[in-house]
């Protein structure tokens, strides 16, 4: 696709807490003229469509309805949130086998419908499931994007904003690597109002140990939320809306997403979180951050962790 049509259509596959939060965020922002909700639980998709329809007098007109995989045929964007949720005490990587099975039953009927748009994947473990979507679909890597570390980077910016009493939108900082336990804060490139975060921290008496604790807090925040209320969904729903907006409005926005590595950071044949330019044709360019030697090692170690789980998961799926 060279550009988006005037009438934009999005299909959401998976109407759980994340999916419905994403649908609500899209409705609030008035993004896309047609929004289809697909899930095996039809009563929920019908109910959500009716509920979201009621918001249109306050937002923007939109055709919202419960649909089928066949509705993907003329969609611009298919967003996959379907999958088993992460339970208390469970890592994202623990979900791999059951969610690979679920994903394999989704991608084929989407592609068989004649869909020729962009896949955006958010189901966990998202880096692995994004890779699997790319493999199962046969689509170009630029048209299969993961939510990656978009939510984690938002958490980092919020935490740094609190620490230094600035608007999180004025913080330019990224979490990179796996969306999960091996992720890391790329502090070497992080800035607040063009000034390096470490310089600002030093001036305010915030030590490297303090920054490391802040990073740990970001890494573990999902577990904190899951333990308190069972799941995370508002943050990731909003992150998905932001990525969708960049695609549908051809923004060429730099966002932290799950992108296919083809030599960047010394990595190949893996999807992993990195800043990238996102627009109407999908992922237009990876922004290869100038990481420190320590950060580059963390990136490569994170990729190695993902690749092992990915290979084991795909092998088990093939043996079934």
Curated annotation (Swiss-Prot):
It is found in: Cytoplasm. This is L-lactate dehydrogenase. Its EC number is 1.1.1.27. Homotetramer. It comes from Lactiplantibacillus pentosus. One of its GO terms (molecular function) is L-lactate dehydrogenase activity. Pathway: Fermentation; pyruvate fermentation to lactate; (S)-lactate from pyruvate: step 1/1. Catalyzes the conversion of lactate to pyruvate. The quaternary structure is constitutionally similar to the active conformation of allosteric LDHs, and the regulation is independent of the fructose 1,6-bisphosphate-binding site. Its main location: cytoplasm. CDD domains: HicDH_like (cd05291). It holds the Pfam family Ldh_1_N. GO terms for cellular component: cytoplasm. Substrate binds at residues 86, 92, 124-127, 152-155, 232. It is an enzyme of class 1 (oxidoreductase). The modification Phosphotyrosine is found at residue 223. One of its GO terms (biological process) is glycolytic process. It catalyses: (S)-lactate + NAD(+) = pyruvate + NADH + H(+). NAD(+) binds at residues 18, 39, 44, 69, 83-84, 105, 122-124, 147. Belongs to the LDH/MDH superfamily. LDH family. The active site is at 179 (proton acceptor). Keywords: Cytoplasm, NAD, Oxidoreductase, Phosphoprotein. InterPro entries: L-lactate/malate_DH, L-lactate_DH, L-lactate_DH_AS, Lactate/malate_DH_C, Lactate/malate_DH_N, Lactate_DH/Glyco_Ohase_4_C, NAD(P)-bd_dom_sf.
């Amino acid at each position: 696709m060279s550009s988006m049509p005037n009438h934009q259509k999005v299909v959401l596959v998976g109407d759980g807490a994340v999916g419905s939060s994403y649908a609500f965020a899209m409705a609030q922002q008035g993004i896309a003229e047609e929004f289809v909700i697909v899930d095996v639980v039809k009563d929920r998709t019908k109910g959500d469509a009716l509920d979201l329809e009621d918001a249109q007098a306050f937002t923007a007109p939109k055709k919202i309805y419960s649909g089928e995989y066949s509705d993907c045929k003329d969609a611009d964007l298919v967003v996959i949130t379907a999958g088993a949720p992460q339970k208390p005490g469970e890592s994202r990587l623990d979900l791999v086998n059951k969610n690979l099975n679920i994903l394999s039953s989704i991608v084929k009927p989407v592609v068989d419908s004649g869909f020729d748009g962009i896949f955006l994947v958010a189901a966990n473990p998202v880096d692995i499931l994004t890779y699997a979507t790319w493999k199962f679909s046969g689509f170009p890597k630029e048209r299969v994007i993961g939510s990656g570390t978009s939510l984690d980077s938002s958490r980092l910016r919020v935490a740094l904003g609190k620490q230094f009493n600035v608007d999180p939108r004025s913080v330019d900082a990224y979490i990179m690597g796996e969306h999960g336990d091996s992720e890391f804060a790329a502090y070497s490139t992080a800035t607040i109002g063009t000034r390096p975060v470490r310089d600002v921290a030093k001036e305010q008496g915030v030590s490297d140990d303090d920054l490391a604790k802040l990073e740990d807090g970001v890494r573990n925040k999902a577990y904190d939320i899951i333990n308190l209320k069972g799941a995370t969904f508002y943050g990731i729903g909003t992150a998905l809306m932001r990525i969708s907006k960049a695609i549908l409005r051809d923004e060429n926005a730099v966002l932290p997403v799950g992108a296919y590595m083809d030599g960047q950071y010394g990595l190949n044949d893996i999807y992993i979180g990195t800043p990238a330019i996102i627009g109407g044709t999908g992922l237009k360019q990876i922004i290869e951050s100038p990481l420190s030697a320590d950060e580059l090692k963390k990136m490569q170690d994170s990729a190695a962790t993902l690749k092992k789980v990915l290979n084991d998961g795909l092998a088990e799926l093939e043996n079934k």
